[in-house]
Amino acid sequence: MEAPMKLEVKVENYVECGINEDEATPLREGTGETPPHAFACGVPMSGSGWCSDPEDGNLVHHSATPTSDEHLQPSLDTIEPKMEPKIKEDADNAMLDSLLADPFENNSPATLQTPADVKPNAMLDSVEQGSRSCELLPSEFSKRENLDDMDLFSLKAAKTLVPDEQQSFPQNDTPIDDPEAADLIAQKREILKMLEMTAENRKVKHKKKKHKKERSHRSNKHQEESRKRNHSNSSSDEGADDKNQFDCDYRGHKKYKNRRGSASSQNESSKERKLRDTELDYVPVRPDEHFIRPIKFSNLIERRPPQVEFNTVNLSKADKRSLAVARAELVLEQIQQKANKEEPPEFHMVDTICKLPVNESFRNQDCFENPSPICNNMNVVYKFNSTPGTRIDLSKWGLETVPEATKRLLRLLGIDVARLKELQSTVKPSQRILKLKKEQLEQGLAPTEEQETATLYKNAATQTERRTATRDAGTQVRLESKLNGAFWQNPHFDPMNLTQHQSNVMLALQEIYQTLPSATMAVKLSRALAPALAIIKGRQP
């Protein structure tokens, strides 16, 4: 077991000492450099701590913490007067000040007095490596405040100190051999050029401010004149007011037009106008831009050429004849393409070969005239017999087959079977076709389609009744005579609900037929057919 360690924590209340903390602390002139052996291992920490001074020399003593009653004891050291802080000047600034303050004489050799902190070899390179602004001056002198505070000569006095390029050589035309003197002259010339540029910029800014003041003064004068004109009761002023009512922009601000004979506009030259326009902080608004004309988004979009829609309702005999000729030519072209085994450029799509019942067909008994086994009505029973020799009228059911040549022709013409039946009932065939049919009937050559029967053979799949019929019952569609089912157990059941449900089924079938296939319809159908699928899966072994 390790022995417990005792730690004594001494809490000291720092009371106000003899030195007031609110007073500004004087800056130190210099700090003692850290000895190289200060952080070496095995060396005592001498010359550091609370009571250590750099003048102690080799005296070794440990740093002691200040006691609590130390501030009550009289201080033995005399309080020295506060020294004003010395601002440390930058090396670049000091060198530039010395360059500007040093007068140049052609006879005496040029010497550069550098401060103590700057190396003697650092000439123009040290100045160029410093931070520079966009005006090729150090960043300390690029600000306006620093330029105003600089203690420099005026431009005229500085030009007298630096000789021009023509006077750079002495009278005996001997060039200066000292390269340092030539560098000094070049530096001072550059500084003078930069100072001239800053002075010109100040003049331009002063002109801009002066122009702005003049503009504001002119606008105030115009406002006062307009107020005086509005208060006058003369007839000429009234006519002017009536005209000025229309000289307003959409924001209600009046436009004041300068007179052509005003002295300010006549004296103003084109250069001054261009200068005034360039001095503006905003883009002037043209007179045609005062009002915004909204444009419809439909006008911005490129319009498609209008498609010509043929009038198929009220056609004249000439139009019908031209359409029939065009249709026949197109059919002949497609037949020729198919004979040459070419890829057809277009196809005629037919919706269906059979018609669905019309809405409210239960009440009108239309759906029972030509029903379809595809539509399984709620209140209709379809009954088939398996007696051989039974002929089912497929045209009644909407399942009539046509010859192969007729199928191809119908596909080319884009006509369905229902439309073909309508044409057969309305259109009268030609005498040639009637003569051919009559000859076939006389010879006993009936069409093969009429001889075919739709007998359902005896097998387990075709039996709809438990017992096989022994007589020709035929194919019939009848209403349920006996009401049997879950609905009829309730004596208060209204049969009209079933008829309404029947019409709803017809409408739903029409919607399913007319709409395009979508994922939502597939989900609805799968939910409705889920019980039937479960029954079929349960029957399978």
Curated annotation (Swiss-Prot):
Where along the chain is composition biased (Basic and acidic residues)? 241-251, 269-279
Q: In which tissues is it expressed?
A: Expressed in female gonads (at protein level).
Locations listed in the record: Nucleus
A GO CC term?
Answer: transcription repressor complex
Start and end residues of each stretch annotated as Nxf2-interacting region (NIR): 315-343
Record remark on domains: N-terminal region is necessary and sufficient to enforce silencing of an artificial reporter gene.
Protein name from the UniProt record: Protein panoramix
Q: Which organism is it from?
A: Drosophila melanogaster (Fruit fly)
Its organism's taxonomic lineage begins at: Eukaryota, Metazoa, Ecdysozoa, Arthropoda, Hexapoda
Q: What is the name of the gene encoding this protein? A: Panx
